[in-house]
Amino acid sequence: TSLKGVLGNMSDEDIEINVEKGVVYVSISDKLLFRSGSYTVTTKAKEVLGKVAKVVNDKPNLEFMVEGHTDNVPIKIEGIVDNWDLSVKRATAVVRILENDFDVAPARMTAAGRSYYIPVADNDTSANRAKNRRTRIVVLPKLDQFYDLIEQGMKAAQ
């Protein structure tokens, strides 16, 4: 089961899948997952996360990180210290749903908050800020497989 195949029927502007240097990145816009300024996951989000869970549960050797990203607009909501806090809470909310609702093994997941420090666009317009508010699932390559590839490359180079 591939992520593109499973998520293909979702709106392209809300989900983006990229592969760079052997790492798979799945970015999901925050409007699909959360209400503004909130880390409570929406009903629509559970549908998307269920599809992601199906793929990762089919590949038990995959480990992945769930990253929360925000724009740079200061947040003033009770219970949330700042954008970094919000990004961590959003990543953790996604990880908990994957574990509790879809039985993804918690040892395979890392939750990380990135705040507004890794934008995909300048924060100069509301459209660009919306692009920066996202949750990114980073499928991590297994290091032992990575080292095997390096060793093979070294042997081939000799």
Explain the meaning of each model-derived region.
Residues 6, 51-52:
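A ubiquitous structural signal for well-ordered alpha-helices
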Residues 24-29:
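Short, aliphatic-rich beta-strand segments
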Residues 33-51, 59, 69-158:
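Periplasmic OmpA-like peptidoglycan-binding domain that tethers envelope proteins to the cell wall
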